[in-house]
């Protein structure tokens, strides 16, 4: 990735971003869920990713409810394991329940909302390679 930089006297030049990730990846995304049925929020391939850390912002705009959580996910090739923690919300309880499984060669992060109103999940995922 390149960006413009200045030398302080007004001269511009291109430079290369200083971060190179060799054993991990940084991904972000958005998923909207308008049901209380269990739904896939995100997936990653079991043959390339061993574990991931998610930072997730959850918005139920219909009811003006907001929550932010962290989740750690790992797998052994057959089963997936998830730990959700650090929930901060303006509501009396969590807006969703998180689970994880392995299906079709992917780890799936699953959400089950407490309401069927449209809920937006914005996330950042840091994943570690196998």
Located regions from the model:
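Extracellular repetitive beta-rich solenoid segments
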Residues: 1-20, 44-52, 58-67, 74-79, ...
